[in-house]
A protein has these predicted regions:
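Charged, low-complexity amphipathic helices and coil/IDR segments
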Residues: 369-456
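Generic multipass alpha-helical transmembrane bundles of integral membrane proteins
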Residues: 1-5
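Anaerobic metallocofactor- and corrinoid-dependent redox/one-carbon enzyme cores
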Residues: 6-35, 45-368
Length: 456
């Protein structure tokens, strides 16, 4: 039963059985299920991928099967899944669905990632969306799990941190929703670990990402309904940017931005750190760029000032682009570590202050008013607002030059992909899309829908 394309499911489950490696099961004997039950849960999890994608994008095949309404989808550019606890207490979790949607390949080959947040966190979903449309790269959804100080690491492992990790690091760890591209198995021309735009990834890199990932029976103490969790270790040395959109009553959305790097630890040290939480979840160690003052005075200060236990993290140092985008949307940025010479805000910001620019951001955004209307408890972006942002991005082609340089190549890649899979994947297709979203609740799942404006 269920509303999905059974023919595509057959293709998907065959691919999953061949390419997804099932790792060890660490459940206690009393919580361990039979192999037949794990097989059924694996099949159910793959069906969840199809259903979530079709809910977002639609699928004309469903109309042929008699499900005309469901075939339309919601034209969602991003989405999320609450899961805990109403769903996961009695059904398999979303920890296969979420990372596969966020990854730039599946049984149909390479494709654009589908922005998908876990735990119904619309704010982190929006952060992932902003990161995605600015970089054209898939994102990590992570818990800000733990700050590990140099003293704590040495006490529990005997290892002395050095290099970028010398002042400590953040353990970013969540059981699902982190893209499999974050393994760091993709490489640039110099052999450095990267997360590539989807059209650049090779078949060899897809295989390497999959080899570096294992799927494990979910911890029944967290997920009584079962399912699977994803594990890999993110390669060190990658420049990354963490962001977080928070909502403040009476103020609205506010943004945090932090550039930094991933780091690696010796295997035995990493194993000890992983065992303090859950060793079967994705492992990413993050060090923010420290400034010696404010929220970036130390790694601990970064964690203490972060607005939630979730963060959206993407490849590259693109904090300046996020700050510029936030100014267009009238979203104040109240914490960042981007060097001032890289930041471009509208000149109209100057009369609101030149010394304390974070405070000036709040005054300017209040004066110019945030570009949205309010419908009930939902923040809805107006078409005029999106058109304004699109025009502003056009005026800032130099700032966003790297994105525009990929337009022609991306269009060709999308056309090839559409021809290969025989369906519209609702990809960017040569358009730079500025997307701002409103949260819509449907069937217990948070869908982030948006108006779009293409500007090429």
């Amino acid at each position: 039963g269920g509303i999905y394309d059974s023919a595509e499911y057959d293709k998907a489950i065959a691919w999953a059985r061949e390419h997804l490696t099932i790792g060890e099961n660490r459940n206690l004997p009393a919580n361990t299920r039979t192999q037949e039950e794990y097989d059924r849960q694996f099949e159910y999890s793959i069906k969840m991928v199809l259903v979530a994608r079709d809910l977002m994008e639609g699928n004309p095949r469903l109309a042929e099967l008699g499900y005309v309404e469901e075939a339309g989808g919601h034209n969602a550019i991003a989405a999320g899944f609450q899961g805990q606890r109403q769903w996961t207490d009695c059904r398999p979790n979303g920890d296969i669905m979420e990372p596969l949607l966020n990854t730039t390949f599946d049984w149909n080959g390479k494709r654009q990632e589908v922005v998908f947040a876990t735990e119904g966190d619309a704010c982190n979903g929006l952060s992932m969306l902003f990161n995605s449309v600015l970089t054209n790269r898939p994102q990590l959804f992570s818990d800000v799990r733990t700050y590990w100080s140099p003293e704590a690491v040495e006490r529990v492992t005997g290892h002395q941190l050095e290099g970028r990790a010398a002042k400590g690091f953040i353990d970013l760890r969540n059981s699902g929703a982190t893209t499999l591209n974050a393994t760091g198995q993709e490489r640039d021309a110099d052999g450095n670990p990267v997360i590539k735009p989807w059209w650049e990834i090779t078949e060899e890199e897809i295989e390497a990402d999959l080899r570096a990932t294992t799927f494990h029976a979910a911890n029944a103490e967290y997920f009584p309904g079962g399912g699977f969790s994803t594990h890999f270790v993110t390669a060190g040395g990658m420049p990354v940017t963490a962001s977080r959109l928070n909502f403040v009553a009476g103020l609205g959305p506010v943004l945090q931005v932090s550039e930094g790097w991933t780091i690696e630890l010796p295997d035995e040290v990493r194993d000890t750190i992983e065992s303090r939480t859950d060793p079967l979840w994705p492992t990413t160690f993050f060090v923010p760029r420290l400034t010696g003052q404010g929220a970036h005075a130390s790694v601990y200060d970064w964690m203490a000032n972060w607005g939630a236990n979730h963060t959206a993290t993407g490849y590259g140092h693109f904090g300046a682009d996020l700050i510029t985008l936030a100014s267009m949307l009238r979203i104040p940025v109240y914490m960042h570590n981007v060097p001032p010479e890289r930041i471009m805000r509208p000149k109209a910001w100057i009369p609101f202050g030149t010394a304390d620019l974070e405070s000036a951001d709040f005054r300017a955004c209040a004066a110019f008013e945030q570009l949205r209307t309010v419908a009930g408890d939902q923040h809805v972006v107006t078409r005029a607002a999106v058109q304004f942002v699109a025009a502003a991005v056009l005026a800032c082609r130099e700032q966003f030059g790297a994105v525009f340089a990929k337009v022609a190549e991306e269009r060709r890649a999308v056309e090839v992909h559409q021809a290969a899979v025989g369906r519209d994947v609702n990809a960017v297709a040569g358009q730079y899309v500025v997307a701002v979203a409103a949260v819509v609740l449907r069937n217990g799942t948070r869908f982030v829908q948006c108006l779009r404006c293409a500007v090429v």
